[in-house]
């Protein structure tokens, strides 16, 4: 496919600063579309422009953090911009980015990138010659970038080998020109109807079934407060007082109940 359209010889990649990152998982998932993942390897540098993410905000039943902190997911509780890497179904590593203020948990799964630098090296890592399929999907991405559990907890905004960046230079497509689509997330059973997957419309590097890809642009961040919903569900239901108690003994022709207020109870 030649030189990536978003990256030319006059382009450069600047590291993202933590101050630039939204401290909200859903907003950060959208913000990361068009940004870059870079891994500095001994054999060379590989990089890719993020074209697809999924958000797993606080209280999300589909998130690893739903039941609270454990040593395995401690990276999810770090400040926005840290790597959370897990091994999925004993087969693939997956790269996530922490998305909430330190002490709270939320994660963004990086689902797909458009390869920019080190493409031949990525093909070697994947034993794959198909550019379109090289990093389309979180497992493929991690394999192409050689990301594993040793990278869990890395500060992606610091001077580390694995980091997040933004493309700068002449002819670079600005974020405002990128049209972001939204759909439900892929491959989950809990909270499967929530629209928390974001992608660059028109990108051939986006993963998943094509039937999910709509044409409408993202209209704005949808705040889905799983924590509030969970607390509301757990709150005990208030009992009716005598003043508002429904007298179900009253009947009309046809046997239907009449909703009337009962008077004070008579002493027996």
Q: What kind of feature is each model-predicted range?
A:
Residues 240-247, 252-259:
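Intrinsically disordered, low-complexity tandem-repeat regions
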Residues 2-240, 259-268:
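Conserved, well-structured core segments that form or line functional sites
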């Amino acid at each position: 496919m030649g030189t990536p359209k978003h990256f030319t010889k006059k382009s450069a990649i600047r590291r993202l600063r933590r101050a630039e990152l939204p401290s909200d998982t859903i907003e950060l998932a959208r913000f990361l579309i068009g940004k870059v993942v870079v891994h500095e390897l001994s054999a060379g540098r590989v990089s890719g422009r993020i074209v697809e993410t999924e958000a797993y905000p606080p209280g999300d039943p589909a998130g690893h953090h739903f039941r609270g902190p454990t040593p395995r997911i401690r990276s999810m509780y770090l400040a926005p911009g840290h790597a959370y890497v897990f091994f999925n179904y004993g087969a693939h590593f997956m790269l996530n980015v922490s998305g909430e203020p330190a002490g709270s948990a939320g994660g963004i799964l990086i689902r797909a990138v458009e390869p920019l630098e080190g493409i031949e090296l990525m093909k070697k890592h994947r034993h794959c010659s198909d550019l379109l399929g090289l990093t389309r999907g979180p497992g493929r991405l991690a394999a192409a970038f050689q990301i594993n559990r040793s990278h869990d907890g890395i500060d992606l905004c610091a001077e580390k080998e694995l980091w997040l960046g933004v493309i700068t230079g002449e002819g670079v497509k600005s974020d405002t020109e990128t049209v972001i689509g939204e759909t439900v997330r892929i491959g989950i059973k809990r909270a499967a109807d929530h629209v928390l997957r974001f992608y660059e419309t028109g990108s051939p590097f986006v993963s998943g079934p094509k039937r999910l890809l709509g044409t409408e642009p993202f209209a704005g961040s949808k705040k889905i407060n799983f924590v509030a919903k969970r607390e509301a569900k757990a709150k005990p239901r208030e009992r009716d007082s005598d003043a508002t108690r429904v007298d179900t003994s009253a009947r009309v022709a046809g046997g239907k109940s009449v909703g009337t207020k009962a008077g004070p109870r008579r002493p027996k």
